[in-house]
């Protein structure tokens, strides 16, 4: 048994302008090579573009997009008796949000377009409307979990 205590769960910090934890999570995921100021620039430009496109509160669009992409259930590989099964597992809210952000950023990176701010804003608006690559990824994950429902007892 381990002698060390369990690590306390850190509270997510919020960003300086919008005072929003989701924005900060997005910044930390978009970050590359330690260039945080560039990550903030990209996010804030994307938020401005969302404001121009939808003429609504961009943070509510962001929340709606993340809520729409967040998966409830996923599959995990589990080895049972020499064969590997995809076992459906429920996902917690924090892990679900992290997955949603990862999928949104992945989908926006794959998009054709001028710059990352433009691509991210387009993907967020699409996800808020219920379309886009990230939403398709969520639906695909749910389909996989539904197809492998028979292995749920391996949990």
Curated annotation (Swiss-Prot):
Q: Which GO cellular component terms are attached?
A: chloroplast; small ribosomal subunit
Task: From the Swiss-Prot or TrEMBL record, state where the protein is found.
Answer: Plastid, Chloroplast
Output the InterPro entries linked to this UniProt entry: Ribosomal_uS7 (IPR000235), Ribosomal_uS7_bac/org-type (IPR005717), Ribosomal_uS7_CS (IPR020606), Ribosomal_uS7_dom (IPR023798), Ribosomal_uS7_dom_sf (IPR036823)
Q: Which GO terms describe its biological process?
A: translation
Q: One Pfam family from the UniProt entry?
A: Ribosomal_S7
Taxonomy, superkingdom = Eukaryota
Under the heading NCBIfam families, the entry gives: rpsG_bact
Job of this protein: One of the primary rRNA binding proteins, it binds directly to 16S rRNA where it nucleates assembly of the head domain of the 30S subunit.
The entry sums up its family as follows: Belongs to the universal ribosomal protein uS7 family.
Q: What is this protein called?
A: Small ribosomal subunit protein uS7cz/uS7cy
Q: Which organism is it from?
A: Ceratophyllum demersum
Lineage of the organism: Eukaryota, Viridiplantae, Streptophyta, Embryophyta, Tracheophyta
